Amino acid sequence: MKKVLIVLSIEKPNAKKICKEIEAFLSAKGIDSFVYKYDGISHSPELNEDYDLAISLGGDGTVLFTARYSAPRHIPVFPINLGRFGFIANIEPKEWEGELLHLLNGKQALHKRMLLSASINRKNKEIVKYEALNDAVVSGSGIAKLINLDISFNGISFGVFRADGVIVSTPTGSTAYSAASGGPILDPDVSAFVLTPISPFSLSNRPLVLPSSGQMKIKILPARAKDIIVSIDGQEMVSLQEDDEIIISESPNKVKMAGCSPDNFYKALRSKLGWSGSSSPKLN
């Protein structure tokens, strides 16, 4: 390993101190490092692409930003949690040195997480394309939020959804906005999407789990809401127009992450989401 990118969240008060410690640790091992200061707003950093590792130093939002940059460049991500929740960033500040040493010595396994691809088409032309580690959300952003969406999967129509919006999440994103909206939680190794309506007009519009090998199409229909957007991981946003189409499929890119083993996933479900009601169940 020769060069490491450190994505530093400037919003975290203790991030700079830990960043200096990481820089010194890497320097002592003959590894160069470059610090990118992430402000929570920037979208596409202009960085070189010759990094061997990207260290995310912040909360889950910093991990999402780092993952979207790293995945197409095949750069592994080492996520250190400085946030309040830290469901994706499972490496705690007190653990970073030991975990990073394990990684450098080849003793830390990397686990792949799938991303979704969201292509926005207008008048039969692609205007922009994004990748998301968590989700793509189509919603009304004004006072009138109810929108109408024509949704199909592999050419099969699901009909018209009347709702405040819909969430299309990856297994990683199934623990986030989708779960808060009543969607199921998926194991990260499951190859699937979750389609979750947001405050649907009809009670029969329930969440759906769909194979990631397929393609979903979401078409914007006339509605009361005039301000409609698609949000990528809650960080990238595009305004939509009537008849725009969002094409969602599995991205060919995957992000390799440290500290994201199946064991850590289920530990996080218990400790951070209160799954099963207790982190230390007692058996009679």
From Swiss-Prot:
GO terms for molecular function: ATP binding; metal ion binding; NAD binding; NAD+ kinase activity. It is an enzyme of class 2 (transferase). Its main location: cytoplasm. GO terms for biological process: NAD metabolic process; NADP biosynthetic process. It comes from the Bacteria. The active site is at D60 (proton acceptor). Its EC number is 2.7.1.23. It is found in: Cytoplasm. The keyword Transit peptide does not apply. Its cofactor is a divalent metal cation. NAD(+) binds at D60, G61, N134, D135, K145, R162, D164, Q235. It catalyses: NAD(+) + ATP = ADP + NADP(+) + H(+). Disulfide bonds: none annotated. Coiled coil: none annotated. Pfam families: NAD_kinase, NAD_kinase_C. The keyword NADP applies. Keywords: ATP-binding, Cytoplasm, Kinase, NAD, NADP, Nucleotide-binding, Transferase. Involved in the regulation of the intracellular balance of NAD and NADP, and is a key enzyme in the biosynthesis of NADP. Catalyzes specifically the phosphorylation on 2'-hydroxyl of the adenosine moiety of NAD to yield NADP. Belongs to the NAD kinase family. This is NAD kinase. It comes from Treponema denticola (strain ATCC 35405 / DSM 14222 / CIP 103919 / JCM 8153 / KCTC 15104). The gene is nadK.
